[in-house]
Swiss-Prot record:
This is Bone morphogenetic protein 7. InterPro entries: Cystine-knot_cytokine (IPR029034), TGF-b_C (IPR001839), TGF-b_propeptide (IPR001111), TGF-beta-rel (IPR015615), TGFb_CS (IPR017948). Residues 291-311 are annotated as: Disordered. Homodimer; disulfide-linked. Interacts with SOSTDC1. Interacts with TWSG1. Interacts with FBN1 (via N-terminal domain) and FBN2. Interacts with type I receptor ACVR1. Interacts with type II receptor ACVR2A. Interacts with NOG; this interaction inhibits canonical BMP signaling. Interacts with SCUBE3. Interacts with ERFE; the interaction inhibits BMP-induced transcription of HAMP. Interacts with TGFBR3. Several N-termini starting at positions 293, 300, 315 and 316 have been identified by direct sequencing resulting in secretion of different mature forms. Keywords: Chondrogenesis, Cytokine, Developmental protein, Differentiation, Disulfide bond, Glycoprotein, Growth factor, Osteogenesis, Pharmaceutical, Secreted, Signal. One of its GO terms (cellular component) is extracellular space. It comes from the Eukaryota.
Length: 431
């Protein structure tokens, strides 16, 4: 038994680029009219060269110049947990939830949040316009003693220098957790303010710009969300101006309060309550992969042949189409991509893999209605039947493609959730 090589059906099908390489789990399947797939998988271990080729191709499609090697701080920190909530929301939105059709099995999370979702309805709204979400870990945090009237501040810094080119910030949030306070400030009201640091000075306070503030009771607990969209855009365009954020807590009469005493959790708190930043991005330009030529030389050679007997060739074509009826018609077949088998489980959080599928089969005259043939393909089939040396048969290609979302760490241990379009074949047809 051997693994069949897959044929490139159309230039927009990414599967064609991986056809010689997908040997780890490919299968031929009968695809019935009710979209039920029956398959018998063929397994064999990848050789080192094959693994490297696959890794290089998939990284290129994911838009990554190299394999990320993060200094992992744990998948159960607050930032990865928040991003997992967004990942699950995006999967449900695009049909990847239980019973959904958008993402094919197995498309599931590696771990669960096992608690109330961190993401809000507003975050889900931001997902609608975004094609990439990044969370950023706090690089520096320490309390500073300033001159009157501000005595207590907490500083946060985030590295936005690794943002891919062509991505624009559509929304950005700073998130910090506030615990319930049982003593001292029982009935007190706090004003929590977040500032952008414009310029730092020796011996006096930094120049600050107020970004957002919230007023709340000392007894309140939960995640506090501050809008920092404006400064995030500025930092992406001018990274040298990124001097971080400052946070202050005051009573309504202006008394400065230590953020820790107000219940705000810093980097030394529990993993699932540490502060972080999240930004939503949308691509301002589309990048296309170059399409490799496959078989154009052979096709031109076939077209250059002039038959001596046109009628004999036409009769041979009739026989060819008769035998095509006995061969498999254009259908969807199973093809599973396993990130775990590629050894990427240390930086890809979710999914472990996904069912990509591919299209293969005959597009012979006459085309049946279930082949999802275009009008052009119908005409092309007829012309090929009459004059096969002039026009080739239509190709079996995807007619519907779906996206997948991939959640992963970058080199700086930031968590990225990115949507990749046209990655899963939903339906096949003749083109």
């Amino acid at each position: 038994m051997h693994v069949r090589s897959l044929r490139a059906a159309a230039p927009h099908s990414f599967v064609a680029l991986w056809a010689p390489l997908f040997l780890l789990r490919s299968a031929l399947a009968d695809f019935s009219l009710d979209n039920e797939v029956h398959s018998s998988f063929i397994h064999r271990r990848l050789r080192s060269q094959e693994r490297r080729e696959m890794q290089r191709e998939i990284l290129s499609i994911l838009g990554l110049p190299h394999r990320p090697r993060p200094h992992l701080q744990g998948k159960h920190n607050s930032a990865p947990m928040f991003m997992l909530d967004l990942y699950n929301a995006m999967a449900v939105e695009e049909g990847g939830g239980p019973g959904g059709q958008g993402f094919s099995y197995p498309y599931k999370a590696v771990f669960s949040t096992q608690g109330p979702p961190l993401a809000s309805l507003q975050d889900s709204h931001f997902l609608t316009d975004a094609d990439m979400v990044m969370s950023f870990v706090n690089l520096v945090e320490h309390d500073k003693e300033f001159f009157h009237p501000r005595y207590h501040h907490r500083e946060f810094r985030f590295d936005l220098s690794k943002i891919p080119e062509g991505e624009a910030v559509t929304a950005a949030e700073f998130r910090i957790y506030k615990d319930y306070i049982r003593e001292r400030f029982d009935n007190e009201t706090f004003r929590i303010s977040v500032y952008q640091v414009l310029q730092e000075h020796l011996g006096r306070e930094s120049d600050l710009f107020l970004l957002d503030s919230r007023t709340l009771w000392a007894s309140e607990e939960g995640w506090l969300v501050f809008d920092i969209t404006a400064t995030s855009n500025h930092w992406v365009v001018n990274p040298r101006h990124n001097l971080g954020l400052q946070l202050s807590v005051e009573t309504l009469d202006g008394q400065s309060i230590n953020p820790k005493l107000a219940g705000l959790i810093g980097r030394h708190g529990p993993q699932n309550k540490q502060p972080f930043m999240v930004a939503f991005f949308k691509a301002t330009e589309v990048h296309f992969r170059s399409i490799r030529s496959t078989g154009s030389k052979q096709r031109s050679q076939n077209r250059s042949k002039t038959p001596k007997n046109q009628e004999a060739l036409r009769m041979a074509n009739v026989a060819e189409n008769s035998s095509s009826d006995q061969r498999q018609a254009c259908k969807k077949h199973e093809l599973y991509v396993s990130f775990r088998d590629l050894g990427w489980q240390d930086w890809i959080i979710a999914p472990e893999g996904y069912a990509a599928y591919y299209c293969e089969g005959e597009c012979a005259f006459p085309l049946n209605s279930y082949m999802n043939a275009t009008n052009h393909a119908i005409v092309q089939t007829l012309v090929h039947f009459i004059n096969p040396e002039t026009v080739p048969k239509p190709c079996c290609a995807p007619t519907q493609l779906n996206a997948i979302s991939v959640l992963y760490f970058d080199d700086s241990s930031n968590v990225i959730l990115k949507k990749y379009r046209n990655m899963v074949v939903r339906a096949c047809g003749c083109h």
